[in-house]
Amino acid sequence: MIRIVSDGKEFRFKSLPITMGRDEDNDLPLEDVKLSRHHCRLCRTAEGIVLEDLNSSNGTYVNGVRAPRHVLAAGDTVLIGVTTLSVEWDPEAAPPPRKR
């Protein structure tokens, strides 16, 4: 289960990927004029839960740093346009850590 919180609103998703942006065809459409129509996506990889920018005009930021691609960690803050998001997930939703 993936939980995204923005401006006090909570959105829950059972599976990935999740696309976000201004366009209504996104999994999470957001009303923010600074967002691209298809701004970013959350997906699952062997690394964990990954946030990927989809070549947006204004970029995707994690913890204040522009991040075209970022493996999310608990407590990370995501900024897209002027929208701040927190992303939480059930540890079982992410793949196990890689063995070295």
Describe these PLM feature segments.
Residues 3, 7-84:
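Forkhead-associated
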